[in-house]
């Protein structure tokens, strides 16, 4: 799957949880990615973040960073 598609999908998840406030949204986004994304998709978005994370919203960047921690 292309990085652009993954960014779009991850940001959509981020928008869904945005109303919770960033402190609550970040772990919810990360949990969603772990539960519902294929491991290859998670790896690709982690690599995308390592390459600069272009296009990822701030809360999504933090959530993805927590996956690789």
Language model features with spans:
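N-terminal acidic leader/helix
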Residues: 1-22
């Amino acid at each position: 799957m292309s990085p652009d598609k993954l960014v779009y999908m991850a940001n959509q998840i981020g928008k869904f949880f945005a109303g919770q406030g960033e402190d609550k949204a970040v772990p919810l986004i990360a949990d969603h990615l772990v539960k519902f994304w294929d491991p290859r998709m998670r790896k690709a978005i982690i690599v995308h973040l390592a390459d600069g994370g272009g296009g990822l919203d701030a809360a999504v960047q933090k959530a993805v960073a927590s996956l690789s921690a």
